[in-house]
Amino acid sequence: MYFINILTLLIPILIAMAFLTLVERKILGYMQLRKGPNIVGPYGILQPFADAMKLFMKEPMRPLTTSMSLFIIAPTLSLTLALSLWIPLPMPHPLINLNLGMLFILATSSLSVYSILWSGWASNSKYSLFGALRAVAQTISYEVTMAIILLSVLLMSGSFSLQMLITTQEHIWLLIPAWPMAMMWYISTLAETNRAPFDLTEGESELVSGFNVEYAAGPFALFFMAEYTNIILMNALTSIVFLGPLYHINYPELYSTSFMTETLLLSTTFLWIRASYPRFRYDQLMHLLWKNFLPLTLAFCMWYISLPIFLAGIPPYT
């Protein structure tokens, strides 16, 4: 029974991830005044499945100088972590109801750094290694602000549980009292998932393709799947943290509908940003975080700690 529960969670996520690639290509196409994929199936709707078949049927290339075990483990670990992040997410009922759900998501997302670093090192190519080092520095840096923003938000809800966050937002979205945090959080999620304008790891002009330059066929597809799964997850998390979906104990479908709509809109904004903005320079990327976001988030964190103390208030805690 538990295995069926896991499948009913993972299969829709993988299907959503497949269609997100199609939506991205369609949006980029229409924003560049062209059609995008429209050959495979009606309106190109079967394109993701054709891509998956092509990638997994190709022979996986392995350069002679690579470290074989790490070369294969890295993409597998990447996708495994991306899928395991969904475990504590309420939809409206999580797979495992963790009291420290938010901490689990933070800790597991930090582990994805290892898969990037291993893939860059195991490829035994200087371009891969440079791409991996950039990705690791960027991911670790932006995780600092994400953790502080989450801490500030959790001070308002009073619990690390994601269910509690939704209960807190029954009357008002946390987006309204904490909108500067929400803006910084959204930009940090863009950087965390290595998306434009922060896709420095894939700088085509200088790094060919980044840490996955030596990968082809199946292992490359695993990295690709992990990236898009993470995009959906980050937007789902943004939806829960700042735009608490409607929750009524007797109407679970109401929650699912509002949750899906918010996640879809946020994901579309990700793609819209990709089509609109040029890439940042690497030093600007780091300045934005360490000189702008970090002092601001620390100041907000102090504010959210001191406010309930001054007003002798306590957060809603169950």
From Swiss-Prot:
EC class of the enzyme, as a word: translocase
Pfam family, one: NADHdh
Major subcellular site: mitochondrion
Any coiled-coil regions, as ranges: none
EC number: 7.1.1.2
Location in the cell: Mitochondrion inner membrane
GO molecular function, one term: NADH dehydrogenase (ubiquinone) activity
Cellular compartments per GO CC: dendrite; mitochondrial inner membrane; mitochondrial membrane; neuronal cell body; respiratory chain complex I
UniProt record, GO biological process: aerobic respiration; mitochondrial electron transport, NADH to ubiquinone; mitochondrial respiratory chain complex I assembly; response to hydroperoxide; response to hypoxia; response to xenobiotic stimulus
Function: Core subunit of the mitochondrial membrane respiratory chain NADH dehydrogenase (Complex I) which catalyzes electron transfer from NADH through the respiratory chain, using ubiquinone as an electron acceptor. Essential for the catalytic activity and assembly of complex I.
Complex formation: Core subunit of respiratory chain NADH dehydrogenase (Complex I) which is composed of 45 different subunits.
Protein name from the UniProt record: NADH-ubiquinone oxidoreductase chain 1
Species, as recorded: Rattus norvegicus (Rat)
